[in-house]
Curated annotation (Swiss-Prot):
Chain spans, region Disordered: 22-104
Sequence repeats: 27-30, 31-34, 35-38, 39-42, 43-46, 47-50, 51-54, 55-58, 59-62, 63-66, 67-70, 71-74, 75-78, 79-82, 83-86, 87-90, 91-94, 96-98
Composition bias, Gly residues: 23-97
Protein name, as recorded: Holotricin-3
GO biological process terms, semicolon-separated: defense response to bacterium; defense response to fungus; innate immune response; killing of cells of another organism
GO cellular component, as recorded: extracellular region
Family, similarity comment: To T.molitor tenecin 3.
Domain of life: Eukaryota
Region annotation (18 X 4 AA approximate tandem repeats of H-G-G-G) ranges: 27-98
Origin species: Holotrichia diomphalia
Subcellular location, record wording: Secreted
Length: 104
């Protein structure tokens, strides 16, 4: 019985780790990292990594660059994900696997 429980848990972990990003993980990580710095004074970039990477990387980069009045280019996403636009000016998040994340 214990062996079956351990085997079941191992299967769940294997499937979860094979997913490109977990439910909400990638988006939450990226948005938190980039958004916090970008809206303040335009200096903060921050790579949106997050446990899931993926969508989170591109989205986090897009918020990073410009401040509230600034514009300018956004910070880079996590490695492999494109840079995003600045807060008021750039409009366009990073690319990840052909999907464009939304910039602000």
């Amino acid at each position: 019985m214990n062996k079956l429980i351990i085997l079941g848990l191992a299967c769940i972990i294997a499937v979860a780790s094979a997913m490109p990003y977990g439910p909400g993980d990638g988006h939450g990580g990226g948005h938190g990292g980039g958004h916090g710095g970008g809206h303040g004074n335009g200096q903060g970039g921050g790579h949106g990594h997050g446990p899931g990477g993926g969508f989170g990387g591109g989205h986090g980069g897009g918020h990073g660059g410009g401040g509230r009045g600034g514009g300018g280019s956004g910070g880079g996403g996590s490695p492999g994900h494109g840079a995003g636009g600045g807060y008021p000016g750039g409009h366009g998040g990073g690319h990840h696997g052909g999907y464009q994340t939304h910039g602000y």
